[in-house]
Amino acid sequence: CCCSVPKSPTLTFFGAAGEVTGSCTLLETDSARVLVDFGLFQGAPSQEQRNTVPPALDFRRLSAVVCTHAHIDHCGRLGMLPRLGYEGLVHCTEPTATLLPMVLRSSANLQKVRIDEFRNGTGPDAVVLDPAPDPAIAAAAERFEDPPVLYSRGDAERVGRSVVGAPYLAWREIAPGVRMRLHDAGHIIGSASVELEIKHGAQRIRVLFSGDIGPT
């Protein structure tokens, strides 16, 4: 046959699968790669140290990033995007577009405080940020700072300038062959379930990322 068959869209889960935090999912199609959420792993020190190891994907090839809401386990690693090579837009609701820059700046400031605590030996974070025994985690940490800093205030501000808000229920094309529609998830102000419509040959496939639903 002379006609190629379009590759079926795929989903790869890099977090919040078998666990609660670190939400991060990659949607891949023939023509686009969309990352939905890029949140922090939280909890025990071993969980937090996972934040220093980026997902095994080429961020430079991403077509778009979407954020469901401004809770740190869904957005907390967005500040890493400039260091990882992503220079595109971050799509979210209009209220989340207002909140995200503030949340990321606050996170960067908190990381600086934790580094100071580590260096002067004060606070529980001196233990939390101890170098991990896992060689892969330790090597990844060296790419940033030792002890690891995920991103600076400058990184956070750069990402903040790339955030684009969209109204609920309005379709918006965010990547070649991919449209987005946001639905109110009722979780926090601006929270959304993300509906993506993918052009797949003569078909259209829809995928819904629920995000966090409801007030708890």
Task: Enumerate the language-model features and the residues they cover.
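Cysteine-centered motifs
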Residues: 1-3
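Residue-level detector of functional hotspots within protein domains
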Residues: 10-13, 51, 56, 76, ...
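Pre-active-site segment of Zn-dependent metallo-hydrolases
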Residues: 17-22, 29-88, 92-162, 213-216
